[in-house]
């Protein structure tokens, strides 16, 4: 009895038993009552695994020490070899219990898929997707299925309550499908899409294809159309990277969306300002055309002219020509507009291009816009002996406009008075030979009186070589 080791009692306070057990089994980690209560609560399987881990912990810790960093301290490795098996055996059943619990819970779930949930900005993401795909689809409003891009757009004001009951239409733009709630289009009735899915569907003007999809916006890229769809949701179009402002402007004009600073946001401010300047220049020139240019055109037309040459001077320019020695370049036929604002308008090449396009749209022809020298006043006169005096004028560079409204400008103005059938015949006699006989007037020559008296009535049948003045031998 004395040689057999005493069983360990967790509640015992005998110091001899504590020292004896501590020295006889240094690798065993003893537990207090709190630990034993947890082990008892874990069950029989928990106790068996703990004992197994305690008995074989030395071999496993030795293998683990070989694969670990050998630069550690030996005492730290010894402590790790003592603690690791117990920690592993305590935590492993708990993890296994949670895994088994999750498996049982998943097996008890119904096999039907989780219903779809809507993201805050209106996109629909499936519950079976990964978290990365779900976050991407919720932020972009898109999802990729079967190798093609499908973008889902809906009215965010409807809320998640009406998602399943609201209508969906599929738009095909540049081989890309957009699933859209048509109510976002009807909120903008002045746009093309608003008319298509508003009054157009009511009057059966907008019809889908055989698959029930609508092919719209021909010639517009999917990236541009995706940015334009944001206008129906937020009222702002953000120009995507790699898309030029003229391309976005063309798409907005096609879809009847106003291209304004309040609706367009982009990083290239120079291109945006250029487009806005073109719009402003068009409106401004249409005003100048009606108020300043058209009255001068009417004055030229009333005088019988079919073209007009207008020079734009500033308000400070003074034209003082000498009546005796006027300019010799035909400036007297030019119309003059005194307007500093119009002068500043035509100073830019872009504005002149806009003005030329407006005049073409109004049906005018032979349009020329530029800057030329215009004489204002006489500087001096150079008199040459025996010749005409030379007048020197002061010239200023000012814009000019030249236009025509002549209808027959393509025909030749040459008047041909030669009565010939062909341009290759220059001889009048040869040309007259081709005149029909019924148009000819035959004029027979009348005989003269002195010839009737001299010529005999019966001319002799003799030799015709006889001299008529010779005396007849028979007489």
From Swiss-Prot:
Region Interaction with AKT family members, annotated ranges: 146-475
Primary localization: nucleus
Cysteines engaged in disulfide bonds, as pairs: none
Region Disordered, annotated ranges: 1-143, 456-475
Record's compositionally biased regions (Low complexity): 108-142
Ranges of biased composition (kind: Basic and acidic residues): 57-80, 97-107
Regions of compositional bias (Polar residues) in chain numbering: 81-94
Pfam family, one: BTB_3
InterPro entries (UniProt xref): BTB/POZ_dom, BTBD10/KCTD20, BTBD10/KCTD20_BTB/POZ, SKP1/BTB/POZ_sf
Domain BTB stretches: 167-241
Amino-acid biosynthesis found in the keyword field: no
UniProtKB keywords: Cytoplasm, Nucleus
GO cellular component, one term: cytoplasm
Subcellular location: Nucleus; Cytoplasm
Stretches with biased composition (Basic residues): 22-31
One of the GO biological process terms: positive regulation of phosphatidylinositol 3-kinase/protein kinase B signal transduction
Function recorded in the entry: Plays a major role as an activator of AKT family members by inhibiting PPP2CA-mediated dephosphorylation, thereby keeping AKTs activated. Plays a role in preventing motor neuronal death and in accelerating the growth of pancreatic beta cells.
Summary of subunit composition and partner proteins: Interacts (via C-terminal 330-amino-acid region) with AKT1; AKT2 and AKT3. Interacts with PPP2CA and PPP1CA.
Protein name in the entry: BTB/POZ domain-containing protein 10
Upper taxonomic lineage: Eukaryota, Metazoa, Chordata, Craniata, Vertebrata
């Amino acid at each position: 009895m004395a040689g057999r080791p005493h069983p360990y009692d967790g509640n015992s306070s005998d110091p001899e038993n504590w020292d004896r057990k501590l020295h006889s089994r240094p690798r065993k980690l003893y537990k207090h009552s709190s630990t034993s209560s947890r082990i008892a609560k874990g069950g029989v399987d928990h106790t068996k695994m703990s004992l197994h881990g305690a008995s074989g912990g030395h071999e496993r810790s030795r293998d683990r020490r070989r694969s670990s960093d050998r630069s550690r301290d030996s005492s730290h490795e010894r402590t790790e070899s003592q603690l690791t098996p117990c920690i592993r055996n305590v935590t492993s059943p708990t993890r296994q219990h949670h895994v088994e619990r999750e498996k049982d819970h998943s097996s008890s779930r119904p096999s039907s898929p989780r219903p779809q949930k809507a993201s805050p900005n209106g996109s629909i993401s499936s519950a079976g997707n990964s978290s990365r795909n779900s976050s991407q689809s919720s932020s972009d409003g898109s999802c990729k299925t079967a190798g093609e891009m499908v973008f889902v757009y809906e009215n965010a004001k409807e809320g998640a309550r009406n998602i399943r009951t609201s209508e969906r239409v599929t738009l095909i733009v540049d081989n890309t499908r957009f699933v859209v709630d048509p109510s976002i289009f009807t909120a903008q009735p002045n746009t093309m899409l608003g008319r298509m899915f508003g009054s157009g569907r009511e009057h059966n003007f907008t019809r889908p294809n055989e698959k029930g999809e609508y092919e719209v916006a021909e010639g517009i890229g999917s990236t541009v159309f995706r940015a334009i769809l944001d206008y129906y949701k937020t009222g702002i179009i953000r120009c995507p990277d790699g898309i030029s402002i003229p391309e976005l402007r063309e798409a907005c004009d096609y879809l009847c969306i106003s291209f304004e600073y309040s609706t367009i946001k982009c990083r290239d401010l120079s291109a945006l300002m250029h487009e806005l300047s073109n719009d402003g220049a068009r409106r401004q020139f249409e005003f100048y055309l009606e108020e300043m240019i058209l009255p001068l055109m009417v004055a030229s037309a009333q005088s019988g002219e079919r073209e007009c040459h207008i020079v734009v001077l500033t308000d400070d320019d003074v034209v003082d020509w000498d009546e005796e020695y006027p300019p010799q370049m035909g400036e007297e036929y030019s119309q003059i507009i005194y307007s500093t604002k119009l002068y500043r308008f035509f100073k830019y090449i872009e504005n002149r291009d806009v003005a030329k396009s407006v005049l073409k749209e109004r049906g005018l022809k032979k349009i020329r816009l530029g800057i030329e020298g215009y004489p204002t006043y006489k500087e001096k006169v150079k008199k040459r002996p025996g010749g005409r005096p030379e007048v020197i004028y002061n010239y200023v560079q000012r814009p000019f406009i030249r236009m025509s409204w002549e209808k027959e400008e393509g025909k030749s103005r040459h008047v041909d008075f030669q009565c010939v059938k062909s341009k290759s015949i220059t001889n009048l006699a040869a040309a007259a030979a081709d005149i029909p006989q019924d148009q000819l007037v035959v004029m027979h020559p009348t005989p003269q009186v002195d010839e009737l008296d001299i010529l005999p009535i019966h001319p002799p049948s003799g030799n015709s070589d006889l001299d008529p003045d010779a005396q007849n031998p028979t007489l």
